[in-house]
Amino acid sequence: MNVLEQLKRLDEMPKRYKTMERSELEARARAVKERFGRRLFIPGHHYQKDEVIQFADATGDSLQLAQLAAKNSEAEYIVFCGVHFMAETADILTSDDQTVILPDLRAGCSMADMADIFQVERAWAALIERFGETIVPLVYVNSTAAIKAFVGRHGGATVTSSNAKKMMAWAFSRNERIFFLPDQHLGRNTAYALGIRLDEMAVWDPHEETLQGADDLDKVKVILWKGHCSVHENFTVRQIEHIRRMKPGIHVIVHPECSWEVVQQADYAGSTKYIIETIRNAPPGTQWAIGTEMNLVNRLKHEHPDKEIVSLNPYMCPCLTMNRIDLPHFVWALESLEQGAIVNRITVPKDIAAEAKEALDRMLSLA
């Protein structure tokens, strides 16, 4: 099977859904939700389109939604409006009699895909050879189940953008060094906030299979995987300088997946939840430039008309893979359930799920 045939198989939605009017699609979605009742749970990530998020039973970040799905024992079916690694995490945390569905299998995550399990295993072998048994692996929840399992197997834990600082401190209490993947920016920003100097960090390039950015490897405390979020890496210091010239007194708030330089220049930096709460609690009339995904920025702008809210990058596109989950695919997944056909089920092999859960549980035990 060639690549084009494989891509075609990833999107088997009947063409009729693509030509339906939005009003008909919305009516169909509401009807299925009503008929299924509590047997159906729809988590929606903050970065989802409004056309989809309106049907979410809960909105939040990836781990929060997976935990809510696991607690919702009445739900037989979980139609996850997010991306692939999020649905995987939901499958890991839910029971065997719950079914997790992703409306469009093409909804992946470029950052999660930057850490391939074979590359990670080769990197680990090289790092252990160089540094010995002095390393604790930490993995951002924005990662594949296979990488979470690897970290769980080697005594490490997952982290979120909210608890990365706490988890990094935990890892340092266990050993001398940290191997942080797949997002170098979250790792660098978190380590720096803990007092680790930039010259005490090195970047592992999985293609060159080399450590970069450190003159003295013996002083390295944090090894960062060379990965990034394609959305957040597009925010720049120049954009911050420009918005401050145009709007003196504006507050700049960014996600820690942005580069270190951007985070240092911003007024505030924190997780998606932190950004939402900061905007919600800000005084009326204040001005905000937000460095995160455009769907969320637009939603915050709509929800808080008493504040002036703009994107730090006015030319930013929404997360392309998040946007794969659209109303036609969503309705197709729901109506297929009604017809007794489960499309795009996400199932993590039991051995991988068990080790990935170890990494998740280590983090959750410290929450």
From Swiss-Prot:
Reactions accelerated catalytically: iminosuccinate + dihydroxyacetone phosphate = quinolinate + phosphate + 2 H2O + H(+)
Cofactor binding summary note: Binds 1 [4Fe-4S] cluster per subunit.
Key word Electron transport present: no
Gene3D superfamilies referenced in this protein's UniProt entry, alphabetically: NadA-like
Cofactor: [4Fe-4S] cluster
Coiled-coil boundaries: none
Chief location: cytoplasm
Entry EC number(s): 2.5.1.72
Pathway, per record: Cofactor biosynthesis; NAD(+) biosynthesis; quinolinate from iminoaspartate: step 1/1
Enzyme class, broadest EC rank: transferase
Gene Ontology process terms (BP): 'de novo' NAD biosynthetic process from L-aspartate
Keywords linked to the UniProt accession: 4Fe-4S, Cytoplasm, Iron, Iron-sulfur, Metal-binding, Pyridine nucleotide biosynthesis, Transferase
Ligand binding (iminosuccinate): 45, 62, 140-142, 161, 255-257, 272
Binding residues for [4Fe-4S] cluster: 109, 229, 319
Gene Ontology cellular-component terms listed: cytosol
Keyword Lipoprotein: no
GO molecular function, one term: quinolinate synthetase A activity
Location in the cell: Cytoplasm
Family that this chain belongs to: Belongs to the quinolinate synthase family. Type 3 subfamily.
Stated role: Catalyzes the condensation of iminoaspartate with dihydroxyacetone phosphate to form quinolinate.
Annotated protein name in UniProt: Quinolinate synthase
Organism: Geobacillus kaustophilus (strain HTA426)
Encoding gene per record: nadA
